[in-house]
């Protein structure tokens, strides 16, 4: 039986060349809007395997040189698939972690005795307890330290990192507010390990992700932006459409302290690793005509013209040749001969998607209808809802299908 089919159900298939270019030149062309090196994969599993490959190579290179491999590790859920892959390789005896030193990227503060919220426990449960990292090589920020000793504790953490020769790699996730580790919006690029107040957005995420009724503490102790940027290499992972908006800002927008992850743009060896869902709003995926030549399917042409209408605030039938040329769509003029021809074609296509018979109208000419007339009635399967279903009136569509006697 084939499992995990949900990740393979795709309504908008992205051409492979947009996310997996064959050459460095092709990558340079399609990624020119991106300010951090970004690798896009068809699935989370492929992306996690890619990151694990890089970590494995680093660990083995350090082993050959008789050195420690020093890692800063986040505990967010986006890293679980990477940790699972590393554990799998350890279990298959292809990788040892005996030379690895781990520094936890952040910890909640203050913690109550026997708290279930400790991020280091999450790291151990998911990863460290399943591999051969020496216990004495695992370090974490102290969520129990007295308030008057917090600053000294943070300075000691920085010193311990330096004692091991600095960070070789930082593995990070990203929050909805663009936070990395627990660096909230407003964190400066020079910030070191410190105490920080947890923001409302981060608190909501934490409360949703923690499998406990225990109250999230008000603060965190976190590696600072400067601490993370001191790593020789950095990998930032994100999966799924819910991360698409923030990843577009992190990768393509300007650096700002309101988006801490954007500081990774200053690092020469920072890598963003995401799946197609999280890459959805990147220019090369959502608006590929702005960065490369396209194979123009009807669907892509419709997407381009709807985008152009929204950008210019014009109805489709009023778009001109100049509008096309000045907005990266000159290829469509060559394809259709003129803006007028393209406008009429796509206007008619869009018009024919509107119907009061979503299952097809029986005993009617279906030449220009979006759904065929036969067979009737049809058997209709509705998969799990999407956040945008209310916008496209999916509830009304389902109701109409039932009213028109389809087997829903």
Task: Report the location of each language-model feature.
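Active-site rim/loop-helix segments in enzyme catalytic domains that contact anionic ligands
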Residues: 326-408
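Short internal beta-strands
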Residues: 99-107, 238, 271-276, 408
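Class I SAM-dependent methyltransferase SAM-binding "motif I" and its flanking Rossmann-like core
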Residues: 181-225
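Glycine-rich beta-strand-to-loop/alpha-helix junction loops that act as flexible
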Residues: 73-78, 172-176, 239
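Glycine-rich N-terminal segment of FAD-binding domains in flavoprotein oxidoreductases
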Residues: 65-92
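Ligand-binding beta-strand-loop-alpha-helix segment within the catalytic cores
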Residues: 22-35, 95-169, 295
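ATP/nucleoside-binding phosphotransfer catalytic cores, i.e., glycine-rich phosphate-binding loops
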Residues: 2-10, 25, 226, 232-332
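N-terminal glycine-/serine-/threonine-rich phosphate-binding loop
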Residues: 2-70, 365-369, 374
């Amino acid at each position: 039986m084939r499992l995990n089919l949900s990740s393979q159900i795709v309504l908008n298939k992205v051409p492979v060349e947009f996310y997996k270019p064959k050459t460095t030149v092709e990558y340079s062309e399609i990624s020119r809007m991106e300010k951090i090196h970004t690798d896009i994969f068809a699935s989370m599993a492929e992306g996690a395997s890619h990151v694990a490959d890089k970590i494995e190579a680093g660990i083995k290179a350090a082993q050959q040189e008789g050195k420690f491999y020093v890692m800063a590790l986040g505990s967010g859920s986006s890293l679980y698939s990477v940790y699972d892959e590393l554990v799998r390789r350890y279990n298959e005896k292809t990788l040892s972690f005996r030379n690895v030193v781990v520094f936890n990227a952040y910890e909640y503060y203050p913690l109550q005795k026997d708290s279930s919220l400790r991020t280091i426990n999450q790291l151990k449960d998911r990863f460290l307890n399943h591999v051969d990292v020496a216990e004495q090589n695992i370090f974490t920020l102290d969520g129990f330290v007295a308030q008057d000793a917090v600053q000294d504790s943070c300075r000691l953490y920085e010193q311990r990192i330096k004692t091991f020769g600095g960070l070789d790699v930082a593995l990070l996730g990203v929050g909805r507010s663009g936070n990395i580790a627990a660096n909230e919006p407003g964190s400066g690029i020079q910030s070191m390990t410190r105490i920080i107040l947890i923001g409302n957005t981060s608190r909501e995420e934490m409360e949703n992700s923690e499998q406990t009724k225990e109250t999230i503490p008000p603060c965190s102790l976190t590696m600072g932006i400067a601490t993370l940027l001191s790593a020789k290499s950095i990998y930032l992972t994100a999966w799924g459409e819910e991360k698409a908006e923030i990843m577009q800002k992190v990768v393509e927008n300007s650096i700002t302290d309101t988006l801490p992850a954007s500081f990774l743009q200053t690092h020469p060896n920072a890598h963003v690793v995401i799946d197609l869902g999280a890459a959805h709003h990147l220019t090369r995926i959502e608006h590929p005509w702005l960065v490369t030549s396209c194979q123009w399917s009807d669907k892509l042409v419709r997407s381009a013209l709807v985008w152009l209408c929204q950008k210019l605030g014009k109805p489709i039938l009023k778009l001109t040749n100049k509008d096309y040329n000045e907005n990266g769509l000159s290829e469509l003029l060559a394809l259709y001969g003129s803006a007028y021809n393209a406008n009429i074609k796509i206007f008619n296509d869009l018009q024919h998607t509107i119907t009061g018979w979503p299952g097809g109208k029986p005993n009617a000419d279906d030449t220009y209808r979006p759904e065929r007339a036969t067979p009737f009635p049809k058997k209709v399967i509705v998969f799990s809802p999407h956040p945008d279903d209310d916008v496209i009136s999916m509830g009304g569509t389902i109701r109409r299908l039932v009213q028109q006697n389809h087997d829903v």
